Amino acid sequence: MNEPASAGKITAHSVVGQTRPMPIAKVLTVSDGVIAGTREDRSGDVAEEVLTGAGFDVVERAVVADGADSVAEALRALTGGFAGLVVTTGGTGFGPRDLTPEGTRAVVERDAPGLAEAMRLASPLGRLSRQLAGTVGEALVLNLPGSSGGVHECLGAVLDVVPHALDLLAGGRPH
């Protein structure tokens, strides 16, 4: 008997016939322009679309102004008691107010350099990114660039391993 076409599809919550609970995610946009109402939150929208398309349930979105302190405060609120993925968009470049990595570093307990490296290698301009990846309790935090294309490229580079990372953070077995 033929299985439905979706039966073999690998999503963020199914691997080799084993079903996992749907992973959850939060999106934090870091942008003075979005806060001021002079820019639309396109990168946050793209992050939500990509995550939802990969099988994540995006349970919260927030926007903060650029700056290390605002990012750190928001990340503490978003990761406190949370088991899931938190992505930031924006503030990872060389601009004077691009301080998302500094705010992230103040909160992250353990670095995940392989994820950050994979995201940087996803595009030639990624080499200009200062993005970080790391964990806070059972939350995985990924810094993404502020461009819509960069969000697509970076998430595309790591989403295949994020569910496994979340399982490990929740106490799952490595293999």
Say what each PLM segment does.
Residues M1-H175:
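Non-catalytic beta/alpha edge segments that cap or flank active sites
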